């Protein structure tokens, strides 16, 4: 099915939703996510026609009481997991292209530390640069939440900025907390972990 010819509302209806801390590769089905301070990165190999999207909450692993949960929500984990999965599906690192979105300031933070959204955006640009993957398009920062749709077959990405009202901010915060809580309740895995390099 050629999703690129459908109206955006239909693409959104048919899309697989990617929640905070998750990533996915689909051969054809569109991928969608809702972002606040989080960032989503779309990686695509135009020759292999394979792509995927991730959604992360924090740039790096925090040291704390639940390192397993924090690592699953981190950009470092999300980027390596998506990259490795794409390579397993036939993508070549030299051909990969990126589009990235998010890092909004939807909840005011005070204090001297850099906002989570800004840290996420900076991490994304630095990671892509370090890996030699060109960032073809981006929409970072600002007071907006964003709805992102990605067509993995074509590499097309659509980003809709949304004025963040209290209801939207609460929905995003609730989704992020729910996902983090779900991860915290899972038993620790004995499976081989992704090697971050």
Curated annotation (Swiss-Prot):
UniProt cross-references to InterPro entries, sorted A to Z: CheD-like_sf, Chemorcpt_Glu_NH3ase_CheD, Cytotoxic_necrot_fac-like_cat
Pfam families: CheD (PF03975)
Official protein name in the record: Probable chemoreceptor glutamine deamidase CheD 2
SUPFAM superfamilies for the chain: CNF1/YfiH-like putative cysteine hydrolases
Keywords: Chemotaxis, Hydrolase
Enzyme Commission designation: 3.5.1.44
Function: Probably deamidates glutamine residues to glutamate on methyl-accepting chemotaxis receptors (MCPs), playing an important role in chemotaxis.
Chain's gene name: cheD2
Family from the record: Belongs to the CheD family.
CDD domains: CheD
Swiss-Prot/TrEMBL catalytic activity: L-glutaminyl-[protein] + H2O = L-glutamyl-[protein] + NH4(+)
One GO process term, biological-process aspect: chemotaxis
Ligase is among the record's keywords: no
GO molecular function: protein-glutamine glutaminase activity
């Amino acid at each position: 099915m050629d999703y690129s010819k459908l109206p955006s509302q239909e693409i959104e209806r048919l899309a697989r939703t990617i929640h905070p801390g998750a990533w996915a590769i689909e051969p054809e089905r569109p991928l969608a996510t809702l972002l606040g301070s989080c960032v989503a990165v779309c990686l695509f190999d135009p020759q292999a026609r394979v792509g995927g999207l991730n959604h992360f909450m924090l740039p790096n692993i925090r040291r704390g009481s639940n390192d397993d949960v924090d690592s699953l929500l981190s950009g470092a984990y999300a980027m390596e997991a998506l990259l490795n999965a794409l390579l397993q599906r036939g993508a070549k690192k030299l051909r990969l292209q990126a589009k990235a979105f998010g890092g909004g300031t939807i909840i005011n933070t005070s204090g001297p530390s850099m906002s989570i959204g800004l840290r996420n955006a900076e991490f994304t640009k630095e990671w892509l640069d370090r890996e030699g993957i060109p960032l073809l398009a981006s929409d970072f920062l600002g007071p907006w939440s964003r709805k992102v749709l990605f067509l993995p077959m074509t590499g097309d990405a659509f980003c809709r900025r949304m004025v963040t009202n209290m209801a939207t901010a609460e929905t995003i915060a609730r989704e992020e907390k729910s996902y983090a809580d779900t991860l915290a309740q899972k038993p620790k895995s004995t499976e081989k972990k992704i090697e971050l390099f």
